[in-house]
């Protein structure tokens, strides 16, 4: 058992002073005592917050972040960006994927993300053939997460088709493609090694355009009822139009009419949800997986978060393509997008919580923990000891009390104010540095040179 002491910490019931945390040998919060003494405990140097879950990641895309910002096509969109992504995928080796993921996860930790849901769809070799171990690339992701020290929910993706109605996959998708049987075998292969590594597993459909209704039914009936379920949905208007041409229904409308969507589900993006779909999402308890920096980068649109939150909807944040790795930026732009859409200020709040920063942080913690299916998201007994410490010497934060501190950090601060980060009771970032960052950066630079020559 170890102990840490915070002069102020955000607990489920609110801010508390002089908080002593007792942490078990397996990294779980065993006892939490406000108004306690620091005898024998490690004193922390700033306000303590729960670590933030990142509910949507494509690790390999970090290697191409910033490379698609070149004008030339007046109709540039997600679909043209995707062609660049396919060219990157066509070159990646297993070793390169592991290096990229490790570097990414270290950067996430330094920003205050303490767990990630990896939406992993690169399964096969350069020719589209299965590796000798079909789980080769999935296990590379697991090893990278372990090396970095971040919590992981691995989401191996079922990806079978190029478009609605079972259209044949394209050449650029050859590394992604599995049938339902191979996918279920992959899930079974991954359970034991992920559990041994302390990681979690989830079900994942790439999108309604990449799987058939029968495949969804087959996977959901296969007995993995304990796992979260993720899917990309309604990210682009073209997807909505294509789904209507195929089925006569919008993507979310089709999903809710044909599948029992519940709290296990994370609906990634859901950008183009209409009012009826927003209401269905809120009623079901599913999490809206919002990736603000990526959605802006791709020109996707703005999710109706104000309406969704007002109906009790649950949401979380993800860095997706990793053009940004900032808890602050994702949450700030979640609010700012609604302001730009509505041309009004202070949009995302609860009747009992007028502080925007607190509303955003609480919502993303709860939604992220639900989407990852892990015991995280709050500083409570029985939860994993995932936390971050903000800079106690920063004048803006040191002068702010209670929820005003979150407003200061999220709307006027940045990642540099994250000083220390703990995952499962182990410090992975101290004074803004990760022990493996220099070694990882050298390997990452080498990989970038290989990919971009």
Swiss-Prot record:
Keywords: Histidine metabolism, Hydrolase, Metal-binding, Zinc
Catalytic activity: N-formimidoyl-L-glutamate + H2O = N-formyl-L-glutamate + NH4(+)
Record-stated family: Belongs to the metallo-dependent hydrolases superfamily.
Cofactor binding: number and manner: Binds 1 zinc ion per subunit. Can also use Cd(2+), Ni(2+) or Cu(2+).
Biological source species: Pseudomonas aeruginosa (strain ATCC 15692 / DSM 22644 / CIP 104116 / JCM 14847 / LMG 12228 / 1C / PRS 101 / PAO1)
Stated consequence of mutating residue 320 to A/C: Reduces catalytic activity by over 6 orders of magnitude. Still able to bind a significant amount of zinc
Functional description taken from the UniProt entry: Catalyzes the hydrolysis of N-formimino-L-glutamate to N-formyl-L-glutamate and ammonia.
One GO term describing the cellular component: cytosol
Pathway the protein acts in: Amino-acid degradation; L-histidine degradation into L-glutamate; L-glutamate from N-formimidoyl-L-glutamate (deiminase route): step 1/2
UniProt name for this protein: Formimidoylglutamate deiminase
Top-level division of the source organism's lineage: Bacteria
Single GO MF descriptor: metal ion binding
Keyword Amino-acid biosynthesis assigned: no
Mutagenesis / variant outcome for changing residue 269 to C: Reduces catalytic activity by 5 orders of magnitude. Slight decrease in metal content
Extra information: There appear to be two competing pathways for the degradation of N-formimino-L-glutamate in P.aeruginosa: the two-step degradation of N-formimino-L-glutamate to ammonia, formate, and L-glutamate (via HutF and HutG), and the direct hydrolysis of the formimino functional group of N-formimino-L-glutamate to produce formamide and L-glutamate (via PA3175).
Regulation of its activity: Inhibited by the metal chelator dipicolinate. Inhibited by N-formimino-L-aspartate and N-guanidino-L-glutaric acid.
């Amino acid at each position: 058992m170890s102990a840490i002491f915070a002069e102020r910490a955000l607990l489920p019931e609110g801010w508390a002073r002089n908080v002593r945390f007792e942490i078990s040998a397996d990294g779980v919060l065993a006892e939490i005592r406000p108004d306690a003494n620091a005898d024998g405990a490690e004193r922390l140097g700033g306000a303590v917050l729960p670590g933030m879950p990142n509910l949507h990641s494509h690790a390999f895309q970090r290697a191409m972040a910033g490379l698609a910002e070149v004008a030339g096509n007046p109709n540039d969109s997600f679909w043209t960006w995707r062609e660049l992504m396919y060219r990157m995928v066509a070159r990646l080796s297993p070793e390169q994927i592991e290096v990229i993921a490790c570097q990414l996860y270290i950067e996430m930790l330094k920003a205050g993300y303490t767990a990630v849901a990896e939406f992993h769809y690169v399964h096969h070799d350069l020719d589209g053939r299965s590796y000798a171990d079909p789980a080769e690339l999935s296990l590379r992701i697991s090893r990278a997460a372990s090396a970095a020290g971040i919590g992981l929910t691995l989401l191996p993706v079922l990806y079978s088709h190029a478009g609605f109605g079972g259209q044949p996959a394209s050449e650029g998708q050859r590394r992604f493609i599995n049938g339902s049987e191979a996918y279920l075998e992959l899930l079974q292969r991954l359970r034991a090694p992920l559990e041994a590594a302390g990681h979690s597993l989830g079900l994942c459909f790439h999108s309604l355009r990449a799987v058939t209704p029968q495949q969804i039914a087959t996977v959901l009936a296969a007995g993995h009822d304990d796992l979260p379920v993720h899917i990309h949905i309604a990210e682009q208007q073209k997807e909505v139009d294509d789904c209507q041409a195929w089925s006569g229904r919008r993507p979310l409308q089709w999903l809710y009419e044909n599948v029992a969507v519940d709290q296990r589900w994370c609906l990634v993006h859901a950008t183009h949800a209409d009012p009826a779909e927003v209401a269905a999402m809120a009623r079901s308890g599913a999490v809206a997986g919002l990736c603000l920096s990526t959605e802006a980068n791709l020109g996707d649109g703005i999710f109706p978060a104000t309406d969704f939150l007002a109906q009790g909807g649950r949401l979380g944040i993800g860095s997706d393509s990793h053009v940004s790795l900032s808890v602050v930026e994702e949450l700030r732009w979640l609010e700012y997008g609604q302001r730009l859409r509505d041309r009004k200020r202070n949009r995302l709040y609860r009747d009992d919580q007028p502080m925007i920063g607190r509303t955003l942080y609480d919502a993303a913690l709860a939604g992220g923990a639900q989407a990852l299916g892990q015991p995280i998201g709050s500083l409570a007994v029985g939860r994993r000891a995932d936390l971050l410490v903000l800079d106690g010497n920063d004048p803006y934060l040191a002068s702010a009390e209670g929820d005003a501190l979150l407003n200061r950090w999220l709307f006027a601060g940045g990642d540099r104010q994250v000083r220390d980060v703990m995952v499962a009771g182990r410090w992975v970032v101290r004074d803004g540095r990760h022990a493996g960052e220099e070694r990882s950066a050298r390997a990452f630079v080498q990989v970038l040179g290989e990919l971009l020559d």
